[in-house]
Amino acid sequence: MIRIIALLALLILIVALARSRSVAQINRIEATKGSIGSLEGDRQVLAQLSEAGADLSKPTELNFYLYFKDRPSADSAAAHAGAGPLVATVRRAGDDSSWLCLVSGQMVPSEAAIHSHVVRLLALAVAHGGEYDGWEAKVVK
């Protein structure tokens, strides 16, 4: 339910941006549900970041979301999720029905770097019985 509300909120924000062309209304951009985990989805998010005024040559905060049914699975994935600039933390998901492994860090949002993390984290989520739910980035100008 929370994911649906979050996606609806994202769509509303994108429409507001398109209508007003004001980048001040959006400070985070994330993938749409159908494109999560794909190279095309990563390209769409990077294009949205650029359209929102982000300087893609500057490091920004990125968050990758992995969900698990139980804490041991989330902890196991978190032990392998951190790589390079990324650090993993585990907490209850917002809807309290699952566990979130949040993988976060500062990096330059390049297509190659992001997609390599996406592929790795998607495989990690599947290997531990979880679900990869995409990434978001803060708009840094």
Regions found by a protein language model. Give the residues of each.
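Long, contiguous binding/interaction regions
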Residues: I2-K141
